[in-house]
């Protein structure tokens, strides 16, 4: 799937603040909660999860 203009901004948000990138892609749901927990456990797992969600959907 090709990246759109909005996806580029979501990826930038995912690197700076991963839950924000997930929220912009999927809305307020389980994915955001999972990402917040991953960010609390470690910043890198949160980034990986956010990039996965953005690039998958």
Swiss-Prot record:
Q: Which InterPro entries match?
A: PMP3 (IPR000612)
Keywords (alphabetical) are: Cell membrane, Membrane, Transmembrane, Transmembrane helix
Disulfide bridge positions per record? none
| Annotated localization | Cell membrane
Q: How does it sit in the membrane?
A: Single-pass membrane protein
The record's function comment reads:
Plays a role in the regulation of membrane potential. Could mediate a proton leak. Regulated by the spc1-atf1 pathway and so expression is stress-induced.
- What protein name does the entry list? Plasma membrane proteolipid 3
């Amino acid at each position: 799937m090709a990246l759109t203009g909005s996806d580029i901004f979501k990826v930038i948000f995912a690197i700076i603040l991963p839950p924000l990138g997930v929220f912009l892609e999927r809305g307020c749901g389980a994915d955001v909660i999972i990402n917040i927990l991953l960010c609390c456990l470690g910043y890198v797992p949160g980034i990986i999860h956010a990039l996965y969600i953005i690039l998958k959907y």
